Amino acid sequence: MAARNAFYAQSGGVTAVINASACGVLETARQYPDRIGTVYAGRNGIVGALTEDLIDTGQESAEAIAALRHTPSGAFGSCRYKLKGLEENRAQYERLIEVFRAHDIGYFFYNGGGDSADTCLKVSQLSEKLGYPLQAVHIPKTVDNDLPITDCCPGFGSVAKYIAVSVREASFDVRSMAATSTCIFVLEVMGRHAGWIAAAGGLASDERHELALVILFPEQVFDPERFLRAVDEKVRSHGYCSVVVSEGIRGADGRFVAESGSRDVFGHARLGGVAPVIADLIKERLGYKYHWAVADYLQRAARHIASRTDVEQAYAVGKAGVEMALKGLSAVMPAIVRTSDSPYRWEITAASLAEVANVEKKMPLEFISADGFGITEACRRYLRPLIEGEDYPPYAGGLPDYVTLCNVAVPKKLAASFSV
């Protein structure tokens, strides 16, 4: 059987370790030249497939591919472009198959979150209907940690580490200034519906470093009065308070506290900044001087402080995705299965995309403390291993030495263009 080519694309918000997954895919594919020819990457994600804007990863040296493991963000470009329903816009999916057929692509690796899992499943279903042989594998990635079945999502562990470290360091800072200056620090973190990232801030405080923290989770209805009492108690007992707030907290009316009224391309409510809203509330009602910050891109781009566990898992799911495809599996996702908390042990298994697509994993309520503003010991047991270990990139001139690929374009074979 002749070798067939593969297509790899990155989707949605990038992470500190998504390129490690790309590295896992590419290095593993290169080990099977008799089965996989060239791995093409989509320039700017799935949009690259629709527009036949493909990148020939075969033009990259082994050293450059290896360097992806320690390089953040998306080396081939990503996108926030959601393919519509299969019946609603069949033309988009047929276009993908058309491009795949033109370039003899028999393997489809889509590296992203929940929406990407849905797209991968639909492409698999359509290829089967059209009689086009294709192994479609979803490579998990999301800092939100909200994909089902898998113990955790590659990308989350490094964000969790960044937030835990940042909250600890900022809390030390505000604690030292509180007597005569700022006594409130508010940090806004990502997490539209799931409070995993906010929970990671709770790791900043432990038996060795007791810090005055209040965490606002999207799983809990935001009650301004209860929140203000909690903050006031912390300031009175510790002299200061650090607040970690998820961007997705909602009020009793069900609306996002930070909702701006518009929606993004996925139809999700576009959120403004919740940190200044919370900080202003504290100032107005309690009179405390504050500083606020939004972790934003910093939390997901911080490869210099990535979790070694996260890097290893990101690479592993990329590698496993190729191995699953070569075994003939399709419409699956490499899922991480935890076999032990301490020491932390895990393995990879194949999860059906039918059970992954359009399912959002919330943080268990038993991970939130009884007062609603902290994390429990069960949550700590879950989170701690995910931020363990350091995996520093090489440095040059005092800065991380990341790789920029050549990203050589593949000549187009189709006469028809496709607009997105």
Swiss-Prot record:
GO cellular component terms, semicolon-separated: cytoplasm
Quaternary structure (record): Homodimer.
Site (Important for catalytic activity): 141
Matches recorded under Gene3D superfamilies: 3.40.50.450, Phosphofructokinase domain
Classification via InterPro entries: ATP_PFK (IPR022953), PFKA (IPR050929), Phosphofructokinase_dom (IPR000023), PKF_sf (IPR035966), PPi-PFK (IPR011404)
Localization per record: Cytoplasm
Annotated organism of origin: Methylococcus capsulatus (strain ATCC 33009 / NCIMB 11132 / Bath)
One family name in Pfam for this protein: PFK
Gene Ontology BP annotations: fructose 6-phosphate metabolic process
Activity regulation behaviour: Non-allosteric.
Reactions the enzyme catalyzes: beta-D-fructose 6-phosphate + diphosphate = beta-D-fructose 1,6-bisphosphate + phosphate + H(+)
Binding site for diphosphate: 13
Record-given protein name: Pyrophosphate--fructose 6-phosphate 1-phosphotransferase
Family under the similarity heading: Belongs to the phosphofructokinase type A (PFKA) family. PPi-dependent PFK group II subfamily. Clade 'B2' sub-subfamily.
NCBIfam families: PRK14072.1 (NF010675)
Recorded effect of pH on activity: Optimum pH is 7.0.
